[in-house]
Design a protein with these regions (language model features):
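A short beta-strand-loop structural module common to alpha/beta enzyme folds
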Residues: 37-47
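Short Gly/aromatic-enriched secondary-structure transition segments
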Residues: 27-34
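Short N-terminal binding/cap micro-motifs at the start of the first secondary-structure element
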Residues: 21-25
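Divalent-metal-activated hydrolytic enzyme cores
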Residues: 1-12, 17-20, 32, 45-54, ...
Length: 125
């Protein structure tokens, strides 16, 4: 008879851009928000710019870590977006990703933030 694996749980999946300029702000903020060891973290160029990749990680985190919250962070001056990376575009993409994730996983809490290069996390939705 197969032995069931124990449930491994963390509260959140955090998705942010890989940009080195953000790390000094992101790591302390996440730790205060979710605790030292209570989150999965994914760092992708452009963060939600590649929604399909983000969705794969959300699905995986739901399956293997029974997450309850997804935290999506885009940022000012994102080079992965290039000239398209306006504040308006980031806000749209964050809200679009939030809507799509909530449609697939209605029980998940999905939070979106825009990180300014001065370290301010602006809550979007």
């Amino acid at each position: 008879m197969a032995t069931k694996k124990p449930i491994i749980h963390c509260d959140a999946l955090v998705v942010h851009c890989m940009d080195y300029r953000l790390q000094k702000f992101i790591q302390p903020w996440i730790t205060v928000r979710f605790g030292y060891d209570n989150f999965d973290i994914i760092s992708l160029a452009g963060s939600v710019h590649d929604y399909e990749m983000v969705l794969k990680y959300v699905e995986l985190a739901v399956k293997i870590h029974t997450i309850e919250t997804v935290c999506l962070i885009n940022h000012e001056d994102c080079r992965a977006y290039g000239r398209e990376g306006t504040y308006k575009r980031h806000k749209h993409d964050l809200q679009d990703a939030q809507f799509k994730i909530k449609a697939l996983f209605p029980k998940l809490k999905v939070e979106t933030f825009y990180l300014h290069l001065d370290g301010e996390f602006e809550f979007i939705s």
